[in-house]
């Protein structure tokens, strides 16, 4: 994997920094594991914007990823590593001994022809998935389930990982990249290793148009809008907005807590903010 800084042959190329991985498959993805992906421009079923700064972008197909890793006891061989436009991590196409193929999140260091396995009896090896109770303390893991059988939800983006700190009865303690420490049921599965493409954070798109190709629209300051569009809008010339910073809907935006479901914090041992 190489970091390539483009020559400034044009204003749009001047600040471009690319992450080039020669190990990625250069052909088409595996068709049976593709699904159509419709764009909604950040609108809900009423046509109203629920997520700002979305719209346009290149057409994509969704790759069906096996987050559950429930192919227990059947070994698989990594056929190839692929780029996935829907996530920051790379994915691996695995062919199992029974003939089925599945996409999984590719851990850092996984290569074509590597053998992987899942289940309670799987060895502690890069890319293998097994219950947390069977993983040694101090291990680096990713794609961690929060409920047994639900599929991995923690540490799925590029370069992320979780460390297994302690085991106590039916629960284990994990340390997340954010600094948070939380408990998870010991029957939850996790995959050995760190997620691939850790250099993703080093890339620079170089121009606004590259964001538009990815379906990201501009972020406009409230003070630059009209009064009908934002509480900070309007005024003669440049203005401060005239009040403490708020969202377009009038909710305070600097340190104001909006979380309502406090019950889910019972599994958090240490908050990421402390």
Swiss-Prot record:
One of its GO terms (cellular component) is large ribosomal subunit. Residues 50-59 have a biased composition (Basic residues). The keyword Ribonucleoprotein applies. Signal peptide: none annotated. Residues 37-59, 222-262 are annotated as: Disordered. Keywords: Ribonucleoprotein, Ribosomal protein, RNA-binding, rRNA-binding. One of its GO terms (biological process) is cytoplasmic translation. It comes from the Bacteria. Pfam families: Ribosomal_L2 (PF00181), Ribosomal_L2_C (PF03947). One of its GO terms (molecular function) is transferase activity. The keyword Transferase does not apply. PANTHER family: LARGE RIBOSOMAL SUBUNIT PROTEIN UL2M, RIBOSOMAL PROTEIN L2. Part of the 50S ribosomal subunit. Forms a bridge to the 30S subunit in the 70S ribosome. One of the primary rRNA binding proteins. Required for association of the 30S and 50S subunits to form the 70S ribosome, for tRNA binding and peptide bond formation. It has been suggested to have peptidyltransferase activity; this is somewhat controversial. Makes several contacts with the 16S rRNA in the 70S ribosome. Belongs to the universal ribosomal protein uL2 family. This is Large ribosomal subunit protein uL2. The lineage of its organism: Bacteria, Pseudomonadati, Pseudomonadota, Gammaproteobacteria, Oceanospirillales.
